[in-house]
């Protein structure tokens, strides 16, 4: 199978073809996703909650990410694999580069970091040293204590203008992808249209170039609060492989996320 690359996603954006992505944390699910053609995966620090059982993503370490990245890469050797740099792993550009090197050696193709314009120098340092970067704006879970909980971001003119400015700054610094989480559809549309790089949404409506879901949300195995943007594809299909195919089909057709999964 031909490897999926950042260029593959750039082509999707240019051709206005929506694409699906998903989190993965182990060999078996990564292999299954790849076999069904879901070839863009993220080893997210969400593993702190879904795999380790913590209340937030904050306890996750670089070593945790590297461990799961290695497992996912074994299962999906040709996927485009993103890996989160966890909380306090990129406080300085130098620290970011050292930790990015660890997860890249483990098998990642790209690192994802949360934050806006303050990360410009970090993004430049990484990209100049051959580490591709995916930005992450909106609801950035590592900032949960600043936000006072998991809340929609970017409402109001000032907040939306700031996020657009952040997105443009990250792109100018060299970021090649952007994740937008829990923002109003109208803002997601503005940002997606303003950027040349692909934008992946989660809780950002169906106007972004791609979508991502935490696999546990996609299969309805998340305990406790279920995010508004989540959909249990397994409940409708009764089969994990069929659920993966339905998720991909609904993203590609624009059916998912629907109005009921979106914010304004």
Curated annotation (Swiss-Prot):
Entry note: cofactor: Binds 1 Mg(2+) ion per subunit.
Q: Where does Mg(2+) bind?
A: 45, 84, 114
Catalytic center residues: 181 (proton acceptor)
List the catalytic activities from the record: 3-methyl-2-oxobutanoate + (6R)-5,10-methylene-5,6,7,8-tetrahydrofolate + H2O = 2-dehydropantoate + (6S)-5,6,7,8-tetrahydrofolate
- SUPFAM superfamilies linked to this entry: Phosphoenolpyruvate/pyruvate domain
Originating organism: Escherichia coli O157:H7
* Pathway assignment: Cofactor biosynthesis; (R)-pantothenate biosynthesis; (R)-pantoate from 3-methyl-2-oxobutanoate: step 1/2
CDD domains tied to this protein: KPHMT-like
| Listed name of the protein | 3-methyl-2-oxobutanoate hydroxymethyltransferase
Give the protein's function: Catalyzes the reversible reaction in which hydroxymethyl group from 5,10-methylenetetrahydrofolate is transferred onto alpha-ketoisovalerate to form ketopantoate.
Cite the InterPro entries for this sequence: Pantoate_hydroxy_MeTrfase, Pyrv/PenolPyrv_kinase-like_dom, Pyrv_kinase-like_dom_sf
Q: Which residues bind 3-methyl-2-oxobutanoate?
A: 45-46, 84, 112
**Cofactors (names):** Mg(2+)
